Amino acid sequence: MPRYAQLVMGPAGSGKSTYCATMVQHCEALNRSVQVVNLDPAAEHFNYSVMADIRELIEVDDVMEDSTLQFGPNGGLVFCMEYFANNFDWLENCLGHVEDDYILFDCPGQIELYTHLPVMKQLVQQLEQWEFRVCGVFLVDSQFMVESFKFISGILAALSAMISLEIPQVNVMTKMDLLSKKAKKEIEKFLDPDMYSLLDDSTSDLRSKKFKKLTNAICGLIDDYSMVRFLPYDQSDEESMNIVLQHIDFAIQYGEDLEFKEPKEHEDESSSMFDEYFQEHQNE
């Protein structure tokens, strides 16, 4: 039987560890066994138990304290991840060979790991050799995405990971439970966006014609190919969490031996998901 994996990615502070902790709790409520692997060698603490922790293999602090290497925080993290890539046998021993595994990999937040370093791509290829079906889960902080330019920046970060890893990817706006009522109304337009409408909002502040043309090209690419869409993730709302899990399960065909149901908001009905979520929370 196949094994299943989520690569939980996103900028620092986007809520990756919180996502892993709450998703494990949600799956336990559904009688599903889910394990977590920490792949951040700079992590200090997290609110979940792990089946494997990269800090048992190598830690950023140890690398930075090595007088022969003389690395800073970012250089130290890159060194740790490259060392990890050369020691995948450690991960294989930690994972074992249990069938029907479902594992969340809590990844570091540095974007260079996905843009111009081969480490994460090598990890995906290794997991696939171990018969894992892998889905990328790219998180962005909803509090960061309430302005058009920041939203476009978040889309480009998600797109860079998607192109680099070449795996199914679900993009998620986290911390929806922390937004005010006004902010929730503002962010609704970013969940299933009309990029040309956002373009009109953005370019009025641009003084350079070159930047206007670039922004127009980026928005056109995103809108014409429907390459990036976001799902809301509210850790206080079980339905919101279940919708995200359904989309991930569909991407990797989890439970295909069972009678499988597509996410009820899939494709043409996707807008109803956002309407339902915000209707439920409009009076908060």
Curated annotation (Swiss-Prot):
Disulfide bonding pattern of the chain: none
Keywords assigned: GTP-binding, Hydrolase, Nucleotide-binding
Matches recorded under Pfam families: ATP_bind_1
Location of the motif Gly-Pro-Asn (GPN)-loop: 72-74
Region described as Disordered: spans on this chain: 261-284
Record-marked site positions (Stabilizes the phosphate intermediate): N74
Binding site for GTP: G13, S14, G15, K16, S17, T18, T174, K175, M176, D177
Gene Ontology molecular-function annotations: GTP binding; GTPase activity
Matching CDD domains: GPN3 (cd17872)
Role noted for this protein: Small GTPase required for proper localization of RNA polymerase II (RNAPII). May act at an RNAP assembly step prior to nuclear import.
Oligomer status and interactors: Heterodimer with GPN1. Binds to RNA polymerase II (RNAPII). Interacts directly with subunits RPB4 and RPB7 and the CTD of RPB1.
Assigned protein family: Belongs to the GPN-loop GTPase family.
Protein name listed in UniProt: GPN-loop GTPase 3
